[in-house]
Amino acid sequence: MQEKMEVQYMVVSFSHKNVDIATREKLSFSQEEIVPFLQEINVCDSIRESILLCTCNRVELYVSMIDKKRAREHIYECFCTHKNIALEDIKNIALMRLNQYAIYHIFSVASSLDSLVIGETQITGQLKLAYKLAFENALCAKDMTRLMHFAFKCAASVRKETDISAHSVSVASTAVRMAEQKLALCDKTLENLPVLVIGSGEMGRLACKHLQNANAQITLVSRTKENARKLALELDSSINIESWEHLEQLLGQYEVLFSATSAPNCIIQSKMVQVSQKQRWWFDLALPRDIENIQMENLHIFCVDDLEEIVQEHKNAREDSAKKAQKILERYSVEFFKWLQTLGIDPIIKHIRYLAKQSALKELDRAVKKGFLPASYQQNVEKILHGAFNTFLHQPTIRLKQASENPQGDPIIEAMKNVFDISDDVVMLNGYKCEKDTIF
């Protein structure tokens, strides 16, 4: 019998918790860079599958692998090569988690417990897109698919069983709240205040939405004007659309600005900004950052890491919900590993049920054709057979799963495959299915 290699999971993380924004900026990936990077990651024969998650708060690599030492060294070298950062620096700043700690972390990320703004729902969509990109480019398959399905189920349970995501929150909403606080110091509000929003992606959309709730007068600028028009139409508001070519002129007209583009370099440089007697508060929600580090009187520039004060207030308010959510994460982490242990037998059980189904339907069809059974009875007889086979297979299924959880269960699994003539190809095919089959 061929030696069975145990699949392990690893997370290599660079997030707002352990790396400052300047370093995250160096480590950030454009959409076009992700697939080539993951292809190089997967070259290592110790790594089976990989996903890269990039947001304004984190750059994280999720992999399934069989040799943690070789996988880790290869991953560090890939980051070093692609981002031109010294190997020792990568090793010093990377936060690595393995197996149950990796799983708990991924569930925490998906459920927004690890977010800068706890309870924000944007991260789940970002993780789904990261998984989709890797899957569609054949960079991940069953290992990560199983994990992602559990992660999204966990996130849904956290939202359903706690109020952690009540009163829609996000990095954008937190930035708008901070803008309100800064304006209040000057006896001003966002109501009827002209505000410039740069970028029509998800972060720009959220900024517009929360500014709209505050009754601000929004001007939207996007490199693609059509995208800005679509966003304005979606929000059904009186958002003013301006051309990208007018950006430099617009900068001198607004006290409050929110920028959230996916540009690879700064779009607002010091040479574009004029000195003003007015206080200005500009919020850079992008990574890499959109706004250069401009030192100018009356100009206050905030990046995502500067939202910490507001974020802490939010964390304190949701402490009870976070504790409940952590219990849910623990439950799902345990369930995931229990489920992984049964995967060796699950595909076999599915195929035995499939064989039972095919045999029953074949004989039933033959009985109807030969006139032994009226055709009008066929549907009800199918239901009876369904119940009979479920009852018959119930106890064997339990026993087989119990055997599969035992380290000595492999001979039993091999014997079942031999008795029912189940090939390894069939086991692998059924292993991709995350939900349990039924007979009918």
UniProtKB/Swiss-Prot annotation:
Top EC category: oxidoreductase
Alphabetical list of InterPro entries matching this protein: 4pyrrol_synth_GluRdtase (IPR000343), 4pyrrol_synth_GluRdtase_dimer (IPR015896), 4pyrrol_synth_GluRdtase_N (IPR015895), GluRdtase_CS (IPR018214), GluRdtase_dimer_dom_sf (IPR036453), GluRdtase_N_sf (IPR036343), NAD(P)-bd_dom_sf (IPR036291), Shikm_DH/Glu-tRNA_Rdtase (IPR006151)
Keywords: NADP, Oxidoreductase, Porphyrin biosynthesis
Pathway in which the depicted protein is active: Porphyrin-containing compound metabolism; protoporphyrin-IX biosynthesis; 5-aminolevulinate from L-glutamyl-tRNA(Glu): step 1/2
Gene Ontology process terms (BP): protoporphyrinogen IX biosynthetic process
Residues given in the record as substrate binding sites: 55-58, 115, 120-122, 126
Presence of the UniProt keyword Metal-binding in the record: no
Active-site annotation: 56
Record's keyword annotation contains Oxidoreductase: yes
PROSITE patterns: GLUTR
Any matching Pfam family: GlutR_dimer
Note: During catalysis, the active site Cys acts as a nucleophile attacking the alpha-carbonyl group of tRNA-bound glutamate with the formation of a thioester intermediate between enzyme and glutamate, and the concomitant release of tRNA(Glu). The thioester intermediate is finally reduced by direct hydride transfer from NADPH, to form the product GSA.
PANTHER family for this protein: GLUTAMYL-TRNA REDUCTASE 1, CHLOROPLASTIC
Function: Catalyzes the NADPH-dependent reduction of glutamyl-tRNA(Glu) to glutamate 1-semialdehyde (GSA).
Subunit structure: Homodimer.
Protein family (similarity comment): Belongs to the glutamyl-tRNA reductase family.
Stated name of the protein: Glutamyl-tRNA reductase
Species name: Helicobacter hepaticus (strain ATCC 51449 / 3B1)
